[in-house]
Every structure is written in structure tokens, then in C-alpha cells.
UniProtKB/Swiss-Prot annotation:
UniProt KW keywords: Aminoacyl-tRNA synthetase, ATP-binding, Cytoplasm, Ligase, Nucleotide-binding, Protein biosynthesis
Taxonomy, superkingdom: Archaea
Cited InterPro entries: Arg-tRNA-ligase (IPR001278), Arg-tRNA-synth_N (IPR005148), Arg-tRNA-synth_N_sf (IPR036695), ArgRS_core (IPR035684), DALR_anticod-bd (IPR008909), Rossmann-like_a/b/a_fold (IPR014729), tRNAsynth_Ia_anticodon-bd (IPR009080)
Signal peptide range in chain numbering: none
GO molecular function, one term: arginine-tRNA ligase activity
Recorded family membership: Belongs to the class-I aminoacyl-tRNA synthetase family.
Catalysed reaction equations from the record: tRNA(Arg) + L-arginine + ATP = L-arginyl-tRNA(Arg) + AMP + diphosphate
Protein name stated in the entry: Arginine--tRNA ligase
Lineage: Archaea, Methanobacteriati, Methanobacteriota, Stenosarchaea group, Halobacteria
Documented EC number(s): 6.1.1.19
An annotated GO BP: arginyl-tRNA aminoacylation
Entry keyword Acetylation: no
A Gene Ontology term for the protein's cellular component: cytoplasm
SUPFAM superfamilies named in the record: Anticodon-binding domain of a subclass of class I aminoacyl-tRNA synthetases, Arginyl-tRNA synthetase (ArgRS), N-terminal 'additional' domain, Nucleotidylyl transferase
Organism, as annotated: Halorubrum lacusprofundi (strain ATCC 49239 / DSM 5036 / JCM 8891 / ACAM 34)
Amino acid sequence: MFRQFRSEVADALGDALASLDLPTDDLGIERPPDDMDATLASSVAFRLAGEVGDAPPNVAATVADAVDVDGYDYLAAVDTAGPYVNFHPGERYFVDTLDASAVDSGYGALPDRDTSVVVEHTSANPTGPVHVGRARNPIVGDAVANLLEYAGYDVDRHYYVNDAGRQMAVFTWAYERFDESDLAGEPARARAEYDLVRYYRKGNAYLEEADPEAVEAAEEEIAAILQGLEAGDEETYERVGEVVDTVLGGMKECLARLPAEFDEFVKETRFMRDGSTDDIAARLKETDHAVYEEDAWQLELDDWGIDKNLVFLRSDDTSLYTTRDLAHHEWKFDNYDRAVTVLGEDHKLQADQLDATLELLGNDIDRLGHVIYSYVNLPDGKMSTRRGTGVMLDDLLDEAIDRAREAVETRMDDRIRDDDLTEEDVERIAHEVGIGAVRYDIVSKQPAKAITFEWEDALDFEGQSAPFVQYVHARCCGILDEAADAGIEVPGVTADSEGVVDVGALDVDATVFETDAARDLLREVARFPAAIESAADDLEPHTIATFTREFADAYNAFYRECPVVTSDDEELRAARVALVAAAKHTMANALDVLGVEAPESM
């Protein structure tokens, strides 16, 4: 409804400006400031004041007088507030919003666009446990994929596996070279990546500390592995594959805890084995931007504003990561309409070089999008696993669950619902709230901004946190359960002697809402699909987190001012129950976009 209302506002305002012989290229339609009573506003008067030769408030009044609201489904009235032109919907807007949202558990999802998108995210090198500093990638990437699905795209989630670089050659050599007795200490966890990472650390330490002759011999073995991969040697692929698949299996278990799941794990060696990497290198050599310098083939990308050359082939004819990634991206373009990649800020140059080179090769890079993120820090400072130190994602999730469990148990006496929570219930809530707190705190920030993760903020039930917004959903569920127990019809379900049955839409009247709190909440419900559309267009899932906080504020005001089950007015009570159902669906789906559980009780 909000999307249609916005479209009607644009049409009406455009017609008004045209009738005044004023430009219509920038309508300035936006959400009004919080202290302004309007659903949409236009700041166009600021832009036109100079052209008209009058003060913005006077221009706004002239424009408002020229707006004709006749013939629109939702646009009903126009007025001004200083320099702003304000637009107001009629009753049908609220009626249709309540009808659509109260009975549709999938409310907010947009129609199918018949457009395929591949979202590549996480793609951490399979060299050991997932480090907490990289936790932003799977969390943001999963939210981007969810968001695009809600926006009507056909989405595949991919993890690009770096199984061809030097790190994996070193890992494979170390795994074959050393025995358990050579390793220091026990694995930090009983899982494959924690076990095998000890070989990787041992190998790197050996290469730094062993005598020069031993290191030279080791480097020859490592080089042979790399050459074997380039030559397509099946035995080498099997040797490397054993290490990669074992470590990756453990990493999958960690990521499943978030959860972050994938449709396909695409291996880098795939594009060496099928010849596409060689094809990329050959095509690049033929371009006017290719030069052979410093014993390597390079691309000069000055025409794209990039000072640093892209090295795409070494002197021994071995390819580099970016060369293989170019083949990978052309494969994406062959199989999907769009491609989105979530990358850490240290890959920004690589992303720019990739875009420029893909364009040089004749690809339409408008089909490619990047989400660049900064890293997650703990209060102690930046973390690194280069030496095998630091906090792992598993550690963060464990502590989140423990802290959430403690918070839930502390708040047991403050619960409004009179149901008894079992130990299993407490454990379930601890997982939903704890992991939700981590995900929400990370995804709620603009990706480009660095994060310092603070427990006090992430688990604050009264603050701008996951528990704060999750509690809205739990409250909705509690009210709807109470209504059903009292024999009150609930949109979608009602209680009878046989249990719970589907009853579809109810006969409720949204025009009976007499308080601003109810109308304001319904306005928030109405704009959810538009929030999905805008966030998907900009690849900004953090704006949905902002929506949940604003929605929670609106719901809590309604909760304080509008009794639902205890209302004496039957018609008003039915409408409020429907509004609670609409709020439940809206919050559940907003949280689903963010990958955060929506608890039924807390």
C-alpha cells in the first residue's frame, strides 16, 4: 500500500508542477521528520524557491494548491508545514493495509521479478576456524541474500573456495609432512578445522624458523603442488582436496550455527581444470593494456582510475587468484542475471581491478554489485589469526548464548505471560536471543563502518538491540494466544474444540482505530514492503534493522495505550487483534531478512 501511495504522490506532484510550468525532474519525496503529521512529504519547494523567486513556504503553498487528489485510491489530502508539501492517505489505505498484513504470514515479500541473482559471501580461506573478525561477512552476506529473496529475486548463495593458492599448497605440504607428535597442544575444539589448523600453523612456523636448506627443500615441494594444480594433475587435486574438504566441513558446522547456509561451494580449481582461466589469460594478453614487466604479465588500469597494475600471470605461466576469479565471474554472468559479492575492506582494490578488467573483457559490469564491509573488533582492539591467536566465531557464539541464558534467567520474575518455561524453553530462548544479538548488532551497522562489539549493547533488552525488537514479536504472540484462549477470533487461526484451524481473513474495520498510536503502527506496517524494496535496491540490509527499531517504538506505544483482549468494544477489539497479527507478521519477516529468530516467548 505504501508503495502505491508513494507512486500516487509522485504522479500527483508531478502533474501539479507541470501545470505550474515548473521542472519535474526532482520531486524531493521523502519520509517527513518525526514531528510532522504526514505519511510522505516533499521538499521540492527548497529547490524551486530560487527559480520562482519566492520563499520556500510560499512556494510549497502554491504547489499544494495545484495538487489534485481526485481519482487516486489512497492519496486523499495535501497540506503544508512550512516549506514542506505534506501528503495524507485516506481510510482505504489503512483498511487495505490491515486486510493484507493481518492474514498473510509472508507479508512484506514482493512479487517475483523473474531475475536470478547469485550472492557470494564468506568465502574464507579453508585454513582453519572462522575468526570473529570475519564474522561480518556471513552475517551481512546472508542478510543480503535474504533481502533479495524478499524483494522477489531468485537467489543462490555461493561460497567461493580458495583451494588453489599458496596457502592451500603450504597447508597440504604441512599436513603430509608432519605427524600428530610434531604438533603443539590439543585442538581447541573437537572439530576438523580446529584439528587440522595445527598443521597449518606448524608449517608456517617451520618455514619461518627452520634452517635455510630445509626451508628451500620445503619451498620446492610447495611449488610442486602449485605446479601440479596448474598442470591439471589429478593426484595433486586429490591431495589438496582432502585437506580443503576436511577443513571446510568443520567451517560449515560453525557457519550453520548462525545459521549461514549455501546452495553451492564453488571451488577455485574448477576454473583451472575447465580451461577458462587459461582463456582469460590469453585474452588479456591480447589487449592494449597488457604489459610484461617485472617477470609477470600485468594490466595497466590507469584508464579506470586505478594506479596499481593487475598482475594476472607469473613468469612461470602460473595464474593468480584474481585471474581465476575473473573466470569465476564470467561463469556467474553466464548463469545468472546479476551477481553480488560481499567483501572485506582489504579487498576493495581487488574489487575495483576486477570490475575494470571484466569491463575490458567486454562484460556488462552493471550486473555486478559489491558490498564492502569493515571488520569486527572486540573492545581489546583489532584481532588477528596470522599467528593462530585471537577469538573465533565459535567463541563469540558460545559466550552470546551463555550471556543470553543468564539474562533470561534473571528476568524470569518480570515476565508478563503466566506460562511456565521449562529448561528446554530457556535454552531455546538463550540460543535465539544470544545468536540473534550477535547477528543483529553486526548487521544493524552500515557495512563500511568499523564495529566494536559490546556485550552490554548487544544484549540490552531495553536498548536498540535484538532482544528489544524480538520482544515485540514475543508480545504479539502472547496477545494472540491470549485472544485465542478467550475465544476471540485471530486472523489466520482461531481456537475451537478440535484445536486450531485456519479461518482466513476476518471481518474487521480499520476505520475504528481512534488513537494515534494504532494509526502510527499501521503506517509502519504499511511501509514495510517499501522498506524491503529500497533496501534491496541499495543492498543495505542495515536499513531493515533500522526499520525494526522504529517499528518496535511504534508497537510499544500501541501496547501501552491500546488494550487488546480486555477491550469492551467488540469491533475495536477485533481490529486491534488484527493489528497485533499484522505487527507479528511484519516483525517476524523483518527479523527473517536479518537472519534473526523471532521468539514466540521470552
